[in-house]
């Protein structure tokens, strides 16, 4: 039976934008691909736009490229934690690689859902099945997440990503453009004001 991996083939290591803030995370991600279960779990955190989803998907795509027989699943935390049945379904699949994006959403779920996810984590770990998570903050900064889960997120290796330089440059350029627009409007307003006074 075909598995819905949830992966998008456009996300690859080869087209992942690198800067000084994410080179280490990419190296760790590649190491996970080469030795599934050794760095377990891999926990990647960083702000929106830093490339977390791209890197997570690249891991899954590379694993399947190297080992097509592997059972790989990429899923957003929002979808995984929607209800108990979804968590149980994923647990029963026994994926060789389980990738969960935006795990900070755990903090928005009740204790029952968090406990079900804890059972899923323990099952994967016991069977030495690789897990990869992404979040907007490091494990100790997760809000309203059970302490047992926070401890487990730190069992393997944690890597951080920073905002991509190209995006930062774009944001800075947008700020400059906005300031220039305001300045030109002020200049135009002042010029029109002078003309109006001259005609009066």
Predicted segments, located by residue:
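Walker A/P-loop nucleotide-binding motif
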Residues: 38-56
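Short regulatory helix/loop adjacent to the ATP-binding pocket of P-loop NTPases
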Residues: 139-155
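Dynamic helix-loop-helix/coil hinge segments at AAA+ ATPase domain boundaries and subdomain interfaces
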Residues: 4-24
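P-loop NTPase Walker A phosphate-binding motif
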Residues: 53-69
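Conserved P-loop NTPase "ATPase switch" module shared by AAA+ and STAND
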Residues: 91-114, 120, 130-135
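AAA+/P-loop NTPase substrate/partner-engagement loops
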Residues: 65-97, 106
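Conserved AAA+ ATPase "SRH/arginine-finger" region at the nucleotide-binding site
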Residues: 156-168
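Phosphate-binding P-loop
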Residues: 31-39
């Amino acid at each position: 039976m075909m598995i819905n991996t949830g992966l998008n083939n456009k996300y690859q290591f080869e087209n992942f934008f690198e800067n000084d803030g994410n080179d280490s995370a990419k190296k760790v991600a590649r190491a996970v691909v080469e030795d599934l279960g050794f760095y377990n779990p891999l926990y990647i955190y960083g702000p929106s736009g830093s490339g977390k989803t791209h890197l997570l998907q690249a891991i899954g795509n590379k694993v399947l490229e190297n080992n097509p027989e592997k059972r790989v699943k990429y899923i957003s935390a929002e979808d995984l934690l929607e209800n108990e049945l979804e968590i149980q379904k994923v647990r029963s699949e026994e994926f060789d690689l389980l990738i969960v994006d935006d795990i900070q959403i755990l903090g928005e779920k009740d204790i029952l859902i968090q406990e079900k996810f804890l059972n899923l984590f323990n099952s994967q770990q016991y069977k030495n099945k690789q897990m990869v998570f992404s979040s907007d903050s490091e494990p100790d900064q997760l809000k309203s997440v059970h302490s047992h889960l926070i401890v487990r997120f730190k069992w393997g290796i944690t890597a951080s990503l920073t905002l991509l330089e190209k995006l930062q440059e774009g944001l800075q350029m947008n700020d400059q453009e906005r300031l220039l627009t305001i300045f030109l409007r002020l200049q135009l307003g002042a010029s029109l004001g002078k003309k109006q006074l001259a005609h009066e």
